[in-house]
Regions:
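N-terminal accessory regions of S-adenosyl-L-methionine
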Residues: 1-121
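Conserved alpha-helix/loop element of class I SAM-dependent methyltransferases that forms part
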Residues: 114-137
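Conserved class I S-adenosyl-L-methionine
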Residues: 137-146
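Conserved SAM/SAH-binding beta-strand->alpha-helix loop
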Residues: 169-171
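Short loop/helix-cap segments at secondary-structure boundaries that form the rim of catalytic
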Residues: 173-179
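Domain-level detector for long C-terminal conserved domains
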Residues: 179-277
């Protein structure tokens, strides 16, 4: 497996204890003799630890426990207890239940990214590098930036690029959060930000707009009406977990396939970057 570059967004939260990692450590011990399962657990650990330490996580592939993984577990048990099928069957009963728990943890790893780090879009060094190269230093406005992970990565890759990073934190429904922005984020709504910086940039970025609001559709209408020359890039799941139905119904989309190829789908969310008109 080729090692990815390291890319930092800052000091990270440096949490001393993470429930998710504690659970994975137990599973890693249980399945240490099953390489395919062990690799997935180790990669999940690596991803969470990286974000906690202030680094963008590695590329993930499909994380669910597959039928091949199940066969590998059964083969390992058979090799361990070739002459004791009764004992082997009991071990399999225990490990089958553990596998279901592993599968749940791995397929819901994005929930961990969100709960402990407020990282919604899955941003890897490869993805950010490809996007940075595509932007090619053009002045860019990020709206609804959340904690600023996207722009922080772009800034780290190209420090001279002019980036306006904005969010009014309407998305933050919990009353208290210990997660702080990883880059300076100006408190502006999406529409306010476009009106303020629309004449100073060439690109507008929007990532993981909520599916409970039509602010994304309002943004698209504003860009079409007043700033038609701006390039509008959107990260999200078409007709899925992000953005409003109205937005997807009205947006003219171009899949940026070269950038998307750097980040395969790893969970139930088919997250992509699109150029939108």
């Amino acid at each position: 497996m080729m090692l990815e570059q390291q890319l930092s967004f800052g000091p990270g939260r440096q949490l001393e204890y993470i429930d998710y990692l504690d659970a994975l450590a137990d599973f890693l011990l249980e399945f240490q003799n099953v390489p395919t399962v062990k690799q997935k657990i180790s990669l999940a650990q690596q991803s969470v630890r990286a974000i906690n330490q202030g680094f963008y996580p590695p590329t993930l592939n499909a994380m669910e426990i597959t039928s091949d993984d199940i066969l590998a577990v059964q083969a390992a048990i058979l090799a361990r207890y070739p002459d004791d099928p009764e004992h082997g069957n009991q071990v399999w009963a225990d490990q089958r239940e553990a596998l279901e728990q592993v599968d749940y943890c791995l397929q819901n790893i994005r929930d961990e990214f969100i709960e402990d780090f407020n990282m919604y879009a899955y941003l890897t060094p490869q993805f950010l590098t490809a996007l940075s190269q595509y932007l090619n230093g053009r002045p860019t406005l990020e709206i609804m930036a959340g904690q600023g992970y996207l722009s922080a990565g772009l800034q780290a890759l190209q420090p001279s690029q002019k980036l306006y990073v904005t969010d009014n934190q309407d998305w933050l429904n919990q009353p208290i959060t210990a997660v702080q922005p990883v880059i300076d984020v100006e408190s502006l709504s999406a529409l306010e930000a476009i009106e303020r910086y629309g004449t100073e940039v060439e690109v507008v970025l929007m990532s993981w707009a909520p599916d409970t609001s039509e602010i994304d559709w309002q943004v698209l209408q504003l860009l079409r009406q007043k700033y038609p020359t701006l390039e509008f890039l959107v990260i999200g799941e078409r007709d899925g977990a992000t953005d409003s139905r109205t937005f997807w119904q009205n947006a003219k989309l171009k899949d940026l396939t070269a950038i998307n190829a750097t980040r395969p789908q790893f969970d139930l969310i088919d997250e992509k970057i699109y150029r939108v008109q």
